[in-house]
């Protein structure tokens, strides 16, 4: 016979505190005080990433600089590409990204917390490259070039996925 547990469960328990997001303080989910619905409608991926990392929405100059930074961090080390080539074609893309970021962390060790912002931006920049490199190699036997002139993450992803500039 099992005993039925009674009570509030975890209701009212604080699991942690963060300034990144809130739920319910301003009608639903917010990132750094900005309603998620407005961000989804009006902001780009890079603007939201900047907001989460730097605690403010970027002005145009800051956004241009941030996009340029991410663009410079997109390429993958050859040793990571070799690992991605070994992942089966039927793997789930989330598993590929987990393996890719884990391997990248071993290749480019963070060392200490003074490098954490660079490591975070490197991971953000490489996610489209990791999953697309694996996909193109495992499904089409193509060893693709990950460098292009697209300034946005979405543009970069679409360009390397389809092999041409997005329209």
Predicted feature descriptions by range:
Residues 1-167:
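Hydrophobic alpha-helical bundle cores within soluble ligand-binding/oligomerization subdomains
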């Amino acid at each position: 016979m099992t005993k039925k547990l009674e009570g509030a469960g975890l209701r009212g328990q604080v699991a942690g505190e963060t300034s990144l997001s809130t739920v319910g303080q301003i009608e639903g989910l917010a990132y750094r005080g900005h309603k998620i619905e407005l961000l989804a409608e009006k902001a780009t991926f890079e603007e939201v990433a900047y907001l989460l990392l730097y605690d403010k929405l970027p002005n145009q100059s800051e956004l241009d600089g941030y996009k340029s930074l991410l663009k410079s961090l997109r390429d993958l080390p050859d040793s990571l590409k070799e690992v991605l080539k070994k992942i089966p074609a039927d793997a789930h893309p989330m598993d590929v990204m987990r393996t890719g970021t884990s391997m990248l962390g071993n290749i480019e060790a963070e060392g200490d917390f003074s490098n954490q912002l660079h490591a975070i931006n490197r991971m953000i920049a490489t996610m489209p490259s990791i999953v697309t490199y694996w996909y193109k190699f495992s499904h089409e036997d193509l060893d693709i070039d990950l460098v292009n002139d697209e300034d946005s993450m979405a543009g970069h992803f679409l360009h390397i996925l389809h092999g041409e500039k997005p329209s």
